[in-house]
Amino acid sequence: MSSQQNQNRQGEQQEQGYMEAAKEKVVNAWESTKETLSSTAQAAAEKTAEFRDSAGETIRDLTGQAQEKGQEFKERAGEKAEETKQRAGEKMDETKQRAGEMRENAGQKMEEYKQQGKGKAEELRDTAAEKLHQAGEKVKGRD
């Protein structure tokens, strides 16, 4: 296999590696985001359930003020969940942007490798032509 083909293959493999790494980061970020959302929702549900369990009988006996406090708690939990969801969305946007940048960088690297490969091929061609010319001159000199 020629050096040019090796360089091209290495460039393609490196670009593939960049793309795989970018893909893996996006997937990992998305999984992390889903886990964050899930755990936040679960925590809010557990807190709400704990509140209901511990205050079940008391709530039935309490006045409207106790019911108002429970409603405030639910609203705060909803606000917190919404804030967390918004932050997770922002993080996902940042991750997508970073992945795009990585993809662009990989493309630029691939283009650099292609240009380097073309330059090397031209250099080898010129060297081979020069050596062939020199060999021809030597043969003519022997005649």
UniProtKB/Swiss-Prot annotation:
GO terms for molecular function: identical protein binding. Transmembrane segments: none annotated. The keyword Transmembrane does not apply. Residues 1-143 are annotated as: Disordered. Sequence repeats lie at residues 47-57, 69-79, 80-90, 91-101. Belongs to the LEA type 4 family. This is Late embryogenesis abundant protein 1. It comes from Aphelenchoides avenae. The lineage of its organism: Eukaryota, Metazoa, Ecdysozoa, Nematoda, Chromadorea.
